[in-house]
């Protein structure tokens, strides 16, 4: 996708490609969790790709992945109740526009059920979620070709840029509430700590 042509340019977020890294980070934070839930929206075409990548990564870590397919907000409570019934030790929330809109409810349900969860955007731990890992928004915006377009370059001549900087954000207050001690090795790699 170096030069997609037409009027297309921008920055790829790599939401599917970095999902296994989120699983790895959650495994490092909660190594005793042998069953991890994955919240995905089945109406999102990327969901199947995310599930496939995470199932492969989960096998490598000796983790069983439990897939929760939720496409409407009213199904969130029952999805979290099923996590508890299945003894799920942690949760990955897929990057999904509707989940981002529902983030306060998702964070509240994770806290209510004492389920450590990792998310795809820093806004989740900023709002009380445990952890996020994603391409740096600030770095991505700096890479965007908008400024070049405003200077007269044509979008057709600009590549779609892959992110080069990723950020790990951990909310220590939430970790403490969940009785999770963040390993020093993970804390040392954290880009932003929320206390």
Which residues fall in each region the model found?
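Short hydrophobic alpha-helices and adjacent helix-cap/hinge residues
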Residues: 1-195
């Amino acid at each position: 996708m170096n030069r997609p042509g037409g009027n297309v340019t921008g920055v790829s977020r790599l939401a599917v490609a970095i999902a296994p890294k989120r699983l790895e980070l959650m495994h490092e934070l909660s190594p005793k969790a042998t069953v991890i839930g994955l919240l995905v929206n089945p109406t999102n075409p990327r969901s199947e790709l995310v599930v496939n990548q995470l199932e492969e990564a989960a096998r490598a870590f000796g983790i069983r992945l439990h897939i929760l397919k939720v496409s409407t907000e009213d199904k969130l409570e029952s999805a979290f109740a099923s996590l508890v019934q299945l003894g799920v030790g942690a949760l990955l929330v897929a990057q999904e526009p509707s989940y981002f809109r529902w983030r306060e409810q998702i964070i509240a349900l994770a806290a209510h059920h004492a389920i450590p969860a990792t998310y795809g955007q820093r806004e989740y731990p900023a709002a009380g979620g445990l952890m996020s890992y994603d391409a740096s928004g600030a770095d991505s915006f700096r890479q965007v070709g908008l400024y070049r377009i405003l200077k007269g370059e044509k979008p057709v001549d600009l590549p779609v840029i892959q992110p080069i900087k990723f950020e790990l954000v951990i909310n220590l207050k939430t970790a403490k509430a969940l009785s999770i001690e963040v390993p020093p090795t993970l804390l040392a790699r954290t880009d932003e700590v929320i206390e």
